[in-house]
């Protein structure tokens, strides 16, 4: 946990969560599929894999600008392959219990994954399905664009600047910043320390949610 205390004990109208790397870990499964895809298309795996995390599949493919490649068809292939491979997908420690403790109308998931893939991974990890979930199909532009987080706040009926976003990846952090939300960086799945001005959280077993008259707040245990 970082020494930056500003988001702790601060009341919010809602908590917004990224999915992969924030409430569940699917890095190994995703990298297995993307490695297979990259090799098939002659893309350097070592340099490419770090760029996929937190981004929509179609955006990762379009960014490469490969000649003769149908980005939509390739993204659909990626999604189907990832739906089939959920080996090793599991919750970030304490995430499921923490999410279950939240009022249903005060939290949402905002993910770059398509809805079918998101639900598959959540089921594999034991993550509860929220009333509000923004997925790849819901926005025309993915993270780092802030549209997903703004849409989640809108669907919950709250202002985005009254929300706390839980994120792990650079593109998601940029999206939350651009949206105007407060931010907590979840570091549970990071192999290397992250340099950030935002508060950090190593795992959900270290915190609990408190519902008061002014809103939902995060407290350290």
Where are these regions (language model features)?
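Residue-level marker of regulatory loop/turn positions in helix-turn-helix DNA-binding domains and
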Residues: 91, 110, 141
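N-terminal helical cap/lid subdomain that shapes the substrate entry/recognition surface
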Residues: 5-103, 114-116
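Hydrophobic residues in well-ordered beta-strands that form the structural core
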Residues: 25, 109-111, 185
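Asp-based, Mg2+/Mn2+-dependent phosphohydrolase catalytic module
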Residues: 2-13, 96, 106, 115-221
């Amino acid at each position: 946990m970082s020494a930056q205390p500003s988001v702790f004990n601060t009341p919010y109208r809602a908590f917004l969560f990224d999915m992969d790397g924030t409430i569940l870990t699917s890095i190994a499964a995703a990298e297995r599929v993307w490695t297979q895809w990259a090799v098939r298309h002659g893309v350097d795996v070592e340099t490419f894999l770090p760029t996929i995390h937190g981004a929509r599949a179609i955006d990762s493919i379009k960014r490469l600008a490969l000649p003769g490649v149908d980005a939509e068809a390739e993204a659909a292939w990626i999604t189907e392959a990832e739906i089939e491979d959920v080996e090793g997908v599991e919750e970030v420690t304490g995430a499921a219990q923490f999410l279950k403790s939240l009022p249903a109308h005060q939290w949402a998931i905002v993910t770059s994954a398509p809805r079918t893939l998101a639900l598959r991974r959540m089921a594999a990890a034991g993550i509860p399905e929220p009333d509000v979930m923004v997925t790849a199909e819901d926005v025309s532009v993915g993270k780092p664009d802030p549209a997903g987080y703004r849409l989640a706040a809108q669907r919950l009926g709250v202002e985005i600047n009254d929300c706390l976003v839980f994120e792990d990846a650079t593109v998601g952090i940029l999206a939350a910043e651009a949206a105007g939300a407060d931010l907590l960086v979840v570091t549970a799945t990071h192999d290397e320390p992250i340099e950030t001005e935002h508060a950090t959280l190593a795992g959900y077993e270290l915190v609990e949610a408190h519902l008061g008259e002014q809103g939902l707040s995060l407290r350290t245990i």
